[in-house]
Structure formats: structure tokens, C-alpha cells
């Protein structure tokens, strides 16, 4: 019975002590006076209860990383003193380390669970009430180290939050940096695509032009006989030589057959109706005199037509020298008197003149004879 009463009294004292700790605003000064009182007087039961509660607070709250093991094992962790120059801290350490535990403390440990239930969530608020930062100041003393631990944990949480924010900001910055080159690469990609399209169009036009040129060269090669060249320069040379040969052949044909072959097809010749009537071949009649006069008229107009043809074709002087007036053996009056005797002479002279002209032309240009043959 007596033990039960003592336990009840101790519980009441603990509850009262908790209420006093929570309601007191100047806990640091109270703890300082209690520490000084412990130096001269033996500890009372209320002081032991308060120490026990502090010890429970210390166990309930996690220790930060920057606390050393020496501070956790000594009584400085119970009192929560910051700073190295406090003389009361050394005295309290020596006092608590040499103070033997009493029976009330042992009994209070047995009912620690009940005290923890009573204190519960109020430890954080009590720690917030008692704990305050006093780094470097010898006069400022914390009532409970849990306050500093809670504050340090809050600081750690805030530090983690800032780290997360920094990480997010860095990620956002990287995203912005990644977007910036993409925005810069946009115009460059457009310009490169435009250049590629222009190059493709140019290549297609070049292919079409080359295909047309090849087709024309093939057509030209088909017109030239015995053409075996493949390059364009040699094919053009052969075409030029072939055209020169054709011009010479046309000139020789005009010289052999006279102007009566195709007078209207010659380039650069404009013939009047009178000349056309003179150039027309004579009609076959029974009168030899009319036939002779028609031939004489045609031969008298022949040198003028030959000169015009030679000038139109721009013949060489050596060729022009051979085109002269045909020699007339007799006059028209003598021809009319002699009758049919002069007709064969005229024909013979005309044929001789043609032969001598062709021989002189071949003597001046021997290559022309080979090409024609």
C-alpha cells in the first residue's frame, strides 16, 4: 500500500513538473539556478524528475550528425549548452557523473512508458519552447538539447528542400539551355533544307540539258557517214568537214550542168521574169535556125548568171577566173548565112570551153576531184 501511494505521488509530481516545464517562459534561468543549487545542495526529488524528463526528451529526439559522442554521453546533452567557455558546464558534468542514482530515479525508469504517454507529442512543442540557439554566447543556455535538435532537423529539412529546389532549378536551366540550341538550330536547318532543294533543282536541270545535248549530237552523228567518234569536239569537226564537202559538191554540180538545173534553189539569186524566160530550156522545134538562136541567147546570158552565182557562193578568185564569156567563132549574121554549118562549130566550142574550165578547176584544187569521185 505504501509503495502504491508513493508511486501515485511520484506520478502526480511528474505531471506537475511537466506542466511547470511547459508553462514556464524563463526556463533557461531556472535551469541555471538549479545547476548552481546542485553545486551546493543535494538534489531533491523534483530535480531528479526534471532530469529524468530531460533524459527522456534526449532519447526521443534523434541526434544531429554534427554532435560528437562526448556531448551525447555527458550531461551537456541533457542541459543542451552551446559554447565551450561556460564554467557551469564543467561543474554540471562532474556533478552528474559522480552523483549516484537514487531509488526514486530507478522507480521513475519503471514508469517511463507512462511518462512518455503523458508527454507524447508535446515533446516537440516543449523542445521548441525550451530550445533556442546560442552559438558562441556563454550567457545563453538552452533548457533542452532536443530544441536544438528539432531546429537542426528543421534546418536540415529546409536544406533538403533548398537542395531539391536547386536541383529543380538546375534541371530547368538545363532544359532552357537545351531549348536554346534547338531554337538556334531551327533557322540553320531551314537554310540547309533550302540549299538542298536548290541543289536538287539545279542537278535536275543540268541532267535535262545534258540529255538534250546528247540527243542532238546523236542525231548529228547519224547524218555524218562513217562517223565513229564519240567525243563532242571530234564529232563537230567531222560535221564541219562534211558540210564543206557538200558545198564543194554543189558548186561542181552547178558548173557541170549549168544554171538550168535548179535556178530557183540557189541561195542569194533573185531572177527577174525576163531572165527566167531566157533561162527556160528551148522548145523542140523543127527549125534549126530558131534552135540555134535560142541556144545563143542562153549562152550569152550564162556568164552573167555564173558571175552572180559565184559572187553569191563567194568562190575563190581562181574559180572565178575560169568563168568567162564563151568564145564565139562567128557573128549572128554569118551564122544565118552559113546555116547549119555554124551550129556544130558552136556546140564544139561550147563543149571545149566547158572541158577546159573543168580541167582548170581540177588543176587548181586537186583535192576537190578526189572528194567528188
UniProtKB/Swiss-Prot annotation:
InterPro entries attached to this UniProt entry: bHLH_ALC-like_plant, bHLH_dom, HLH_DNA-bd_sf, PIF1-like_bHLH
Chain intervals with Low complexity compositional bias: 141-160, 182-191
Signal peptide (residue range): none
Induction statement: Down-regulated by the A class gene AP2 in the first whorl and by ARF3/ETT in gynoecium.
Gene3D superfamilies membership: Helix-loop-helix DNA-binding domain
Amino acid composition bias (Basic and acidic residues), ranges on this chain: 1-21, 197-210
CDD domains from the UniProt entry: bHLH_AtPIF_like
Keyword Ligase included in the entry's annotation: no
Subcellular location: Nucleus
GO cellular component: nucleus
Free-text tissue specificity from the UniProt record: Expressed in lateral root caps, young leaves, stipules, maturing pith cells of the stem, differentiating vascular cells, shoot apical meristems and flowers.
Compositionally biased spans, kind Acidic residues: 161-177
GO terms, biological process: carpel development; circadian rhythm; fruit development; negative regulation of seed germination; response to cold; response to red light
Family matches, as SMART domains: HLH (SM00353)
Chain segments carrying region Disordered: 1-46, 141-210
GO terms for MF: DNA-binding transcription factor activity; identical protein binding; protein dimerization activity; transcription cis-regulatory region binding
UniProtKB keywords: Developmental protein, DNA-binding, Nucleus, Transcription, Transcription regulation
Domain bHLH, first and last residues per copy: 197-246
Subunit-structure text: Homodimer. Interacts with HEC1, HEC2 and HEC3. Binds to RGL2 and RGA.
Role this protein plays: Transcription factor that plays a role in floral organogenesis. Promotes the growth of carpel margins and of pollen tract tissues derived from them.
Protein name per its UniProtKB record: Transcription factor SPATULA
Source organism of the structure: Arabidopsis thaliana
Amino acid at each position: 500500500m505504501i509503495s502504491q501511494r508513493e508511486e501515485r505521488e511520484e506520478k502526480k509530481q511528474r505531471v506537475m513538473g511537466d506542466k511547470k516545464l511547459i508553462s514556464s517562459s524563463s526556463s533557461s534561468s531556472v535551469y541555471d539556478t538549479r545547476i548552481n543549487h546542485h553545486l551546493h545542495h543535494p538534489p531533491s526529488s523534483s530535480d531528479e524528475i526534471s532530469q529524468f524528463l530531460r533524459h527522456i526528451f534526449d532519447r526521443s529526439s534523434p541526434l544531429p550528425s554534427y554532435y560528437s559522442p562526448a556531448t551525447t554521453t555527458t550531461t551537456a546533452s541533457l542541459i543542451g549548452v552551446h559554447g565551450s567557455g561556460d564554467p557551469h558546464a564543467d561543474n554540471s558534468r562532474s556533478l552528474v557523473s559522480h552523483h549516484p542514482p537514487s531509488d526514486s530515479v530507478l522507480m521513475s525508469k519503471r514508469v517511463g512508458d507512462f511518462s512518455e504517454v503523458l508527454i507524447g507529442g508535446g515533446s516537440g512543442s516543449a523542445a521548441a519552447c525550451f530550445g533556442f540557439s546560442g552559438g558562441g554566447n556563454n550567457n545563453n543556455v538552452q533548457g533542452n538539447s532536443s530544441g536544438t535538435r528539432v531546429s537542426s532537423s528543421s534546418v536540415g529539412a529546409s536544406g533538403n528542400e533548398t537542395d531539391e529546389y536547386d536541383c529543380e532549378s538546375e534541371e530547368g536551366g538545363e532544359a532552357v539551355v537545351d531549348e536554346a540550341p534547338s531554337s538556334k538550330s531551327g533557322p540553320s536547318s531551314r537554310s540547309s533544307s533550302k540549299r538542298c532543294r536548290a541543289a536538287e533543282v539545279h542537278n535536275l536541270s543540268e541532267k535535262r540539258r545534258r540529255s538534250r545535248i546528247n540527243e542532238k549530237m546523236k542525231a548529228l552523228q547519224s547524218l555524218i557517214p562513217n562517223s565513229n567518234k564519240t567525243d563532242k569536239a571530234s564529232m563537230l569537226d567531222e560535221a564541219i568537214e562534211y558540210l564543206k564537202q557538200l558545198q564543194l559538191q554543189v558548186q561542181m554540180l552547178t558548173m557541170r550542168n549549168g544554171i538550168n538545173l535548179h535556178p530557183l534553189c540557189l541561195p542569194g539569186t533573185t531572177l527577174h521574169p525576163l531572165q527566167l524566160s531566157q533561162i527556160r530550156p528551148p522548145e523542140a522545134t523543127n527549125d534549126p535556125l530558131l534552135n540555134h538562136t535560142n541556144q545563143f541567147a542562153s549562152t550569152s546570158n550564162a556568164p552573167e548568171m555564173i558571175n552572180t552565182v559565184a559572187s553569191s557562193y563567194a568562190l575563190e578568185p581562181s574559180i572565178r577566173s575560169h568563168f568567162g564569156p564563151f568564145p564565139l567563132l562567128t557573128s549572128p549574121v554569118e551564122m544565118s548565112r552559113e546555116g547549119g554549118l555554124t551550129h556544130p562549130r558552136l556546140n564544139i566550142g561550147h563543149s571545149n570551153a566547158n572541158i577546159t574550165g573543168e580541167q582548170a578547176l581540177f588543176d587548181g584544187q586537186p583535192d576537190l576531184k578526189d572528194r567528188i569521185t
